[in-house]
C-alpha cells in the first residue's frame, strides 16, 4: 500500500508557516556560522591523514593545468598525486575547479564547500523527517544533524565524506518521495544521487543500501521486485560505479589495493572490537543520544516507517562488520550515523512537542521554553567554538617548510605523521620510503602476515636514502630497536625540539652492519 502525502501537525513554535520558516532559517544561519569559524586554519584538526591526502590529489590536478608554475614544483605536485594511486576524482576535482576559478590554491576553500554541502543537506533531512513525523520532528532531526559537535567538526573536512553523507540524505529523501508518489521524476533523482554518492566514495554503498532496503521492506518484496521503476533506480545507481570499477581494476589496475587489508571477520568474536565500537559511538554522537535514538525507532507510528529506520541501522551494522578494524579505529567511518540518529530522534521530538501543545502554555511559558532551547544551543556552539580556538595549527606550516628546505634535493626515509602527507603537502618533500608505524605492523599481523626482519626491512627502506627523518619522537620511543640502531650507527645531521634527521651517508666509528 502506497501511503498518501502526510498532513502536517501543528508546531509548538506556532501555527504560522512564517514562524516555522523563521526558526529553520535561524538554525540554518547558526549551523553555517559555526562551521565558518577559524576555517582558514590548516586542516589538521580532524583526520589530518585523510584531509591532506585529498589536498595532495587536488593540488596535483591543479598543477597539471598551472603551466605558469615553476617546472620543478609542478612536476613534484603532479608526481605526488600520481604516486598516491587511484581514487574517485569527484571531490578533489571540485576543489581543483575552485582553485582555478579563484586563480590560486586556497586550502580552506574546499573545507568551506564541504560545510555548505553538509548544511544544505539538512534541508532534505528536514523534508524527509517532516514527512515521516511532523514539523517539530523535522526540526529536532535537523537540529541534531546540524549541531552535534562531531558533525560540526567533521562536516568541514577536506575529504569526500561530507559530500557522500549529503548525497545519501538526498537519496533517502528521494526514495521516500518515490514511495509516496511513485513517479519517474523521483526515479531519476534517486538513481543519480545514489550513483554519484557511491561514485564519490565506494563506502557510501552502505547508507545507500540502507535506503533501498527500507523502501523494499516497507513496500514488500514482491511489489518492489516486480516494479520496473525500482529496478531503474538500481541500474542508475550502479552505472557510475561500474564504470569507475572497470577503469580502476582493468585500465589503471590500481583499485585492487584500495580493498586490501580491510576485511577482518576474526574481530567479530573479539570483545575488544565491541568496546572500541562503543567508544566510537560515544565520541561521534554520545551514548545518551544513541540510546534515545534506538528507542525513537519504535515510536514511529506505522510499521512501514519503522522498517525504513530499522534498515538504516541494519546498513550501519553491516558496514561495521564488513570493515571491523577501521570501524573501531577511524571515527569518520561512523559519519553517516549523525543523520541516522537525527532521524531516529524525530519521534521523541514530536512526542515532547505534542505534550507541550497539550499543556497549552501561555506566551511567557512558551518564551521561557524557547529561551531554554536557545541557551542550550548557544552553550553547545560556544563549546565547539572553543575547540576550534584552543589549537592554532598555522605555525606548523613554517615547521614543515623548514624541514623541506633541509631535505630538498636529498632522498629521505621518514618516520612521520600521516603517512608522510604533512611532509609532502606542507614541506614539498616526497620521501623515498615511509617507515611503518607500530599500528601498521599490527594491522599486517592481524591479516596473518609475518612481521618483517628488522635489518632486512631497514636495508630495503633506506637503500636509496641519504637521510632518515623522524618527526614523531613518541613513535620512535615505541620502536626501541629502530631507535637504538639509528643512535649506534648514524650521526645526527640536524635536530630540533620535535624532529631528528640522521645522516645515512656516514656510519659511526665501530658501528656493526
Q: What residues fall within each predicted segment?
A:
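Short periplasmic/luminal acceptor-recognition loop of GT-C membrane glycosyltransferases, typified by
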Residues: 404-441, 466-476
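Transmembrane-lumen/periplasm boundary regions of multi-pass, lipid-linked membrane glycan transferases
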Residues: 53-65, 196, 205-306, 316-328, ...
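Transmembrane-helix motifs of polytopic, lipid-linked glycan transferases
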Residues: 109-132, 170-174
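Short acidic/glycine- and proline-prone juxtamembrane loop motifs at membrane-interface regions
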Residues: 153-164
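Short helix- or helix-capping micro-motifs
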Residues: 31, 141-146, 194, 198, ...
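Membrane-interface transmembrane helices that cradle and orient dolichyl/undecaprenyl
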Residues: 11, 130-136, 171-187, 197, ...
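Transmembrane-helix signature of polytopic, membrane-embedded enzymes
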Residues: 27, 108, 125-147, 166, ...
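Transmembrane alpha-helical segments
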Residues: 32-37, 204, 348-353, 363-392, ...
Amino acid at each position: 500500500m502506497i501511503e498518501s502525502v502526510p498532513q502536517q501537525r501543528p508546531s509548538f513554535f506556532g501555527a504560522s508557516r512564517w514562524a516555522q520558516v523563521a526558526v529553520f532559517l535561524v538554525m540554518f544561519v547558526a549551523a553555517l556560522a559555526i562551521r565558518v569559524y577559524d576555517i582558514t586554519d590548516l586542516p589538521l584538526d580532524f583526520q589530518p591523514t585523510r584531509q591532506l591526502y585529498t589536498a595532495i590529489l587536488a593540488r596535483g590536478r591543479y598543477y597539471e593545468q598551472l603551466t605558469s608554475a615553476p617546472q620543478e614544483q609542478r612536476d613534484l605536485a603532479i608526481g605526488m598525486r600520481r604516486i598516491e594511486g587511484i581514487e574517485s576524482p569527484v571531490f578533489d576535482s571540485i576543489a581543483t575547479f575552485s582553485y582555478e576559478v579563484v586563480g590560486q590554491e586556497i586550502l580552506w576553500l574546499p573545507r568551506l564547500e564541504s560545510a555548505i554541502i553538509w548544511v544544505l543537506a539538512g534541508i532534505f533531512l528536514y523534508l524527509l523527517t517532516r514527512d515521516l513525523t511532523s514539523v517539530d520532528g523535522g526540526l529536532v532531526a535537523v537540529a541534531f544533524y546540524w549541531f552535534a559537535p562531531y558533525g560540526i567538526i567533521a562536516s568541514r573536512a577536506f575529504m569526500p565524506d561530507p559530500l557522500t553523507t549529503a548525497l545519501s540524505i538526498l537519496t533517502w529523501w528521494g526514495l521516500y518521495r518515490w514511495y509516496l508518489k511513485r513517479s519517474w521524476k523521483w526515479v531519476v533523482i534517486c538513481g543519480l544521487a545514489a550513483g554519484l554518492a557511491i561514485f564519490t566514495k565506494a563506502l557510501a554503498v552502505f547508507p545507500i543500501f540502507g535506503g533501498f532496503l527500507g523502501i523494499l521492506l516497507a513496500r514488500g518484496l514482491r511489489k518492489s521486485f516486480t516494479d520496473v521503476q525500482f529496478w531503474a533506480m538500481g541500474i542508475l545507481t550502479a552505472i557510475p560505479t561500474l564504470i569507475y570499477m572497470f577503469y580502476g581494476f582493468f585500465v589503471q589496475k590500481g583499485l585492487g589495493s584500495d580493498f586490501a587489508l580491510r576485511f577482518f571477520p576474526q574481530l567479530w568474536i573479539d570483545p575488544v572490537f565491541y568496546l572500541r565500537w562503543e567508544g566510537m559511538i560515544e565520541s561521534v554522537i554520545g551514548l545518551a543520544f544513541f540510546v534515545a535514538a534506538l528507542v525513537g525507532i519504535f515510536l514511529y507510528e506505522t510499521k512501514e516507517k519503522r522498517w525504513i529506520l530499522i534498515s538504516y541501522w541494519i546498513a550501519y551494522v553491516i558496514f561495521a562488520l564488513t570493515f571491523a578494524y577501521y570501524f573501531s579505529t577511524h571515527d569518520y567511518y561512523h559519519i553517516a550515523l549523525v543523520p541516522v540518529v537525527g532521524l531516529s530522534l524525530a519521534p521523541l521530538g514530536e512526542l515532547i512537542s505534542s505534550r507541550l501543545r497539550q499543556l497549552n502554555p501561555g506566551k511567557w511559558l512558551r518564551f521561557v521554553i524557547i529561551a531554554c532551547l536557545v541557551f542550550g544551543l548557544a552553550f553547545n556552539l560556544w563549546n565547539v567554538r572553543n575547540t576550534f580556538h584552543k589549537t592554532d595549527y598555522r605555525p606548523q606550516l613554517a615547521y614543515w617548510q623548514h624541514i623541506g628546505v633541509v631535505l630538498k634535493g636529498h632522498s629521505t626515509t621518514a618516520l612521520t605523521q600521516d603517512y608522510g602527507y604533512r611532509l609532502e603537502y606542507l614541506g614539498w618533500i616526497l620521501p623515498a620510503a615511509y617507515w611503518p608505524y607500530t599500528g601498521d605492523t599490527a594491522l599486517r599481523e592481524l591479516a596473518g602476515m609475518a612481521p618483517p626482519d628488522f635489518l632486512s626491512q631497514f636495508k630495503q627502506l633506506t637503500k636509496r636514502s641519504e637521510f632518515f627523518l623522524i618527526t614523531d619522537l613518541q613513535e620512535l620511543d615505541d620502536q626501541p630497536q629502530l631507535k637504538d640502531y639509528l643512535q649506534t650507527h648514524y650521526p645526527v645531521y640536524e635536530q630540533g625540539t620535535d624532529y631528528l634527521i640522521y645522516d645515512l651517508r656516514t656510519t659511526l666509528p665501530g658501528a656493526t652492519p
